[in-house]
Amino acid sequence: MITPRPLGLYLHIPFCVKKCAYCDFYSITDASRMDAFTDALIRSIREYGEKSAGRTTDTVYLGGGTPSYLGGARLERILHAVRENFALAENTEITVECNPESTDAVLLDALRRGGANRLSFGVQAAHDNELRRIGRIHDFAKAKNAVLLAHEHGFSNISLDLMYGLPGQTQDMFLDSLAQCLALQPTHLSCYGLKLEPMTEMGREAPVLPDND
């Protein structure tokens, strides 16, 4: 008898304070819809949990959007629903994407109670002028403090996202951002090149980007 492969569960949390200038993922800013969304998502979790009976799940990923903007109480409800309706493997990795601006002690405590064991922070750059150019709502000091706070709250598995090819960015600036992110001792670091999508703010404006050299 062939044993079914473990499942990977992705939950999209579409809410953002504002849309970043480069982002083409689906997102909304209407926070008044958060409670209704959470209730609907939990109903879907129960439905799909029934359909997955007999299979284990070894990865759970809450992406967005900005999952942390949903708030600790709602995220804790969602994470508990996942645990109650899916057969999680003993070492299941449960990741929640966090924006530094919406990360605080209350959120981190709720994520711990919900069973999250990995956080992913969209740092993107260590220079505030670069962050402003791409429409990020946080500065690097806020990002640094959020990562340190996560460590203090017991999260040892932390991933950071960093971008290169930003408008006005030099190679030295990127390398400095890389060094400052590595100094935060993440478990994982992802580097992404800026891609101008046509339906985004930056795609419509077509800023001058660094050359490939």
Language-model region placement:
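C-terminal scaffold of the Radical SAM
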Residues: 2-8, 27-51, 55-213
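Local cysteine-cluster metal-coordination motifs and their immediate loop/turn environment
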Residues: 12-25
